[in-house]
């Protein structure tokens, strides 16, 4: 089954809402419309930028989408500081990242919470981008495949086969995030194939064949082509490079099958 690549730009805690408008305009200006037929492009700004991005995307009828960096497992109530999927849906979010390694590390989120957040996203018509990945010690011990498969199971626990079939999975080796170190294309393929094989067991081989599996970890315009050329890698969760409008547009074009003219 042909899977349309997805390039998702995770801005993390960067850019205020004025800067967000400028960056989205830069991406839209730099990426010719023809590429959107071959690649889905989404930006993942901070919560405080979402309304400004929504207004720009809707007003200018831009073909890129946007999403949130997190979502609460709760729909409403006395949960100070939490952001409901209902709110994100009203803002037009297509995606919500759940289980990012920085959330797991700094906020001690475990697989059960990630699964609950993924379920909450689905309740509100939002596609979760479920992140998994190993630390360097796990990689060096040669247990990276088993680690990621186990984390995948836990992070999707309780979801239906149909929901799993609609999710996006992002493999992000923790040792490669923001470090400049990148998993080799063959390494990314090894884990992403194992992920897809496990998805086939958790849902069905037919559904798994259509699930997009992304790679995340120091992706840029120089390495994205080799990474997304792998059979089981369907795009990238991009960090620092997504803050550069021209570079993000270029790597999106490369993922679509051709460099910018």
UniProtKB/Swiss-Prot annotation:
Subunit and interaction comment: Homodimer.
Isomerase keyword on record: yes
Protein name in UniProt: Triosephosphate isomerase
EC top class, as a word: isomerase
NCBIfam families membership: tim
One GO cellular component, as annotated: cytosol
InterPro entries noted in UniProt: Aldolase_TIM, TIM_sf, TrioseP_Isoase_bac/euk, Triosephosphate_isomerase, Triosephosphate_isomerase_AS
Positions that bind substrate: 10-12, 178, 218, 239-240
Organism: Mycobacterium sp. (strain KMS)
Keywords: Cytoplasm, Gluconeogenesis, Glycolysis, Isomerase
Functional pathway: Carbohydrate biosynthesis; gluconeogenesis; Carbohydrate degradation; glycolysis; D-glyceraldehyde 3-phosphate from glycerone phosphate: step 1/1
Chief location of this protein within or outside the cell: cytoplasm
Record-linked CDD domains: TIM (cd00311)
Key word Cytoplasm present: yes
Molecular-function GO term, any one: triose-phosphate isomerase activity
GO biological processes: gluconeogenesis; glyceraldehyde-3-phosphate biosynthetic process; glycerol catabolic process; glycolytic process
